[in-house]
Amino acid sequence: MAKSNPNKQSVELNRTSLYWGLLLIFVLAVLFSSYIFN
C-alpha cells in the first residue's frame, strides 16, 4: 500500500505540470497573436 502511494502522487504531479505547461503555452500564444495583430 505504501509503495503505490508515491507512484500515484508522482503521476498526479506529472499530470498537473502537463496542464500548467499547456496553460502557459495557451497564454503565450494569445499574447503573441495579440502582439502580431496589433
Swiss-Prot record:
SUPFAM superfamilies: Photosystem II reaction center protein L, PsbL. Its main location: plastid. Belongs to the PsbL family. It is a single-pass membrane protein. It comes from Pleurastrum terricola. The chain crosses the membrane at residues 17-37. PSII is composed of 1 copy each of membrane proteins PsbA, PsbB, PsbC, PsbD, PsbE, PsbF, PsbH, PsbI, PsbJ, PsbK, PsbL, PsbM, PsbT, PsbX, PsbY, PsbZ, Psb30/Ycf12, at least 3 peripheral proteins of the oxygen-evolving complex and a large number of cofactors. It forms dimeric complexes. Pfam families: PsbL (PF02419). The gene is psbL. This is Photosystem II reaction center protein L. Keywords: Chloroplast, Membrane, Photosynthesis, Photosystem II, Plastid, Reaction center, Thylakoid, Transmembrane, Transmembrane helix. One of the components of the core complex of photosystem II (PSII). PSII is a light-driven water:plastoquinone oxidoreductase that uses light energy to abstract electrons from H(2)O, generating O(2) and a proton gradient subsequently used for ATP formation. It consists of a core antenna complex that captures photons, and an electron transfer chain that converts photonic excitation into a charge separation. This subunit is found at the monomer-monomer interface and is required for correct PSII assembly and/or dimerization. InterPro entries: PSII_PsbL, PSII_PsbL_sf. GO terms for cellular component: chloroplast thylakoid membrane; photosystem II reaction center. It is found in: Plastid, Chloroplast thylakoid membrane. It comes from the Eukaryota. The keyword Heme does not apply. GO terms for biological process: photosynthesis. Coiled coil: none annotated.
